[in-house]
Amino acid sequence: MTSAEIRQSFLDFFAARGHTVVPSSSLLPDSPGLLFTNAGMNQFVPIFLGDRRPDVSTWAGARPGSDTRATDTQKCIRAGGKHNDLEDVGFDTYHHTMFEMLGNWSFGDYFKKESLEWGWELITGVWGIPARRLFATVYRPGAGEPSELDQEAHAIWTGIFARAGLDPARHIVTGNKKDNFWMMGDTGPCGPCSEIHFNLLPDDDEAAGRRLVNAGNPRCIEIWNHVFIQFNANADGSFSPLAAKHVDTGMGFERVAGIHASTRGFTDFSRDPSNYAADVFAPLFARIAALSRKTYQATVPARREGLTAQEDIDVAFRVLADHARCVSCAIADGILPGNEGRNYVIRRILRRGILYGQKLGLANGFFEQLVDPVVASLGPVFPELGQRRDIIQRVMRGEEESFGRTLERGLQIFARAAAAGGGAIPGAAAFELYDTYGFPLDMTQLLAAERGLAVDTAEFERRMEEQRQRGRAALRKEVVVAATAGETAADLTPTKFLGYTATSAHGRVIDVVESGPDVFLVFDQTPFYAEMGGQAGDAGAALIDGHAYAVVDTVKDKAGRHLHKLGPALPALPPAAGLRGAAATLAVDVPRRRAISRHHSATHLLHWALRKVLGTHVRQAGTHKTPERLRFDFSHFEAVTHAQLQEIERLVNEKVIDNARVETYETEFDKKPEGTLAFFGDKYGRIVRVVDIGGYSRELCGGTHVGTAAEIALVKIVSESAIAAGTRRIEAVAGQAAIDFVAVRESALAAVSAHLSAGPADVARKLETLIAHQRELERQLKSFQQKASAGLADSLAAGATARAGLKFVYAVAAAESPEALRSLGSQVLAKLGEGVVVLGTPFGDKATIVALCSPAAIQAGHQAGKLVAALSAKLGGRGGGKPDYAMGGGRDVAKLAETLTEA
């Protein structure tokens, strides 16, 4: 069987047993707490939690079967966070950053008997894996661990092995919570699991195989895990049965396909198994071999340093094959290389691949050439790869060009640090490589390990923390204070926010906070929005005991209290102790709040339009909304064209005119509408707030918004620029700010129209005519200048003096620029043949000198650099250069003629 046939036979086997074949979900997970989709069950979590009824037959792209049974092959990435295989990839034959997880699921339908018996039927009956080589693990709790022996699974396996003519006592192995009990988290659904292990020793000795189960030996590995979700873990540490029991299984596709290839169809176990033997990697290996003119021989190093030449080559082949698959699939799912979170992980993987490409001698620009073989091998099952091939290649090209500009210099820095001795790369050098040259720490560690060196990670982390502290200090609104000594954030009560429905309210002062020169009031409740999620804090006024206090900003502390910053020109505040408990009337500056809300709602529309025009890979990377403008940072791999910006702006204003309602409501995170955008790294509780504009734009958001889209009035894009590799920034204005922006533009256009004596519609055409005329005049002027310069060169050459076989010209000459003076000097020297030319010209308040020496003049001891240095000094300046050409000058313009005459 080919790898593709193994995959398809798995899906067909379960489809024939009533399972709906669902497409792989995106590598961009729905849960903001996950870096990447890292298991087949991720997309089914809401069903397991009871937040969504089983309805898989209705899912887009599904091959329908039962709603309560599903099967698929899921793209997974494990690189970064808890699951991080990155540093091992390449050095063995079974680690990957990206892999496929084959799986089947039951949602309150069949349970252990069907799951285990079908699994056995597939791997022994359909695929032909020798039954004698298989072992099953069953949960047996250790001291203090939950539940009891999974007697049900044990009995099922006993029957399976007995019917196969095998001794169940030899082939069933028990494991504790670490190996055979699955938990989604500290609380929630959980249950025992049963794994199938495959003995890959050259002989099929049962006792030897049994000893290797769960021993971490690559000659006896787990190939399929069956998880039986039957309990709920409670907060008090107890476990209670679930009303509906589920099955969740997972099988590593590359692992099974690799074993099949390594063992010639599960028949020859003489060779070491390798996932990379699977033919799914063959197109990539062929392309790498063609590019590098080297051959993959499947060697595996015993250690990280002192590799043979062939081991180095084979490690690089495996790294490139794995990383090309990972980065291609990530970009296809909208995860672009970047500087934070999951985007930074993808950038690290890509740069690690580029570094290994250099080890194979591959030229800059090679990585994008690995996309075609990825599409060839994975495109039929993951069609988004073929559909987005061009985007994938363009992103890779830009990343490789960007990193290539600093890679060589960074390698030089590393080489110097390595040569300095001491047994370790200093943390300062590792930080410089990271901060200046874009080397992730693990890349520096990799380079160091190859030389038998360590990296001073403690010093590296210290410098990283210093940088983070500097960044925090630069943020104007980072207010972290405690109310009184001895209190912590946990002791303080968050402020009750009323501002979604009110712009004025009554409250009581509960604290006065002083932070340097700034004074903040804290109330028990407030209509003032505190800066959060990029939205500026509210301003307004607080009336306390008949005194009006201006509130110029509102921020939040760690306890969730709203801190109302008071303006500088205020009535004297009573002592803090006397102020606590005082009644207050709070009023938000409503026009200012409305302006901010317009910009916030406009930001949501802009995000929607960007994804519509540029693609769903666009993701918010940062945002700021003020009364005056909005700023939106987003992931994208190239500059947005003028035509694209026009279309984005048109779509946004089209939706403004359509005047859809802007609805906000709270729901449980796992029950939010499909397609609602959440942002990785943001902290979401169980209850979240959804902002829905017309059903087409849905985001989790805690900010304030307009009631209908038409309240935004108008949106105008002001600028688009790059702020980092893979990250763009758009600045725009909305509402009155947009109207003012248009008015300024119209005023400027009217002024230009008046100067050109042309109507606004004719300005562009009139300018094109004037520019064309100007260019023609410049061409004619340049021609005249060249003729004049040639004549001047003749005149200067004719006045040369001769000495010792050389000709000399020292003169003040007319030239319109230093470049023209140099050109004139070159012309004069060409006419002299062998000699020295020194020319000077005043430009404003500075005299400029150029000197040129022919080869014979240099041979005779004349040097342009020394001449210019001496003459410039006389003019009160300095200069120098090479023996054949130099430029300098000084500010004593009056001495120019005298200086050249003396020379």
Predicted segment positions?
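A glycine- and charged-residue-rich anion-binding loop/surface
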Residues: 1-903
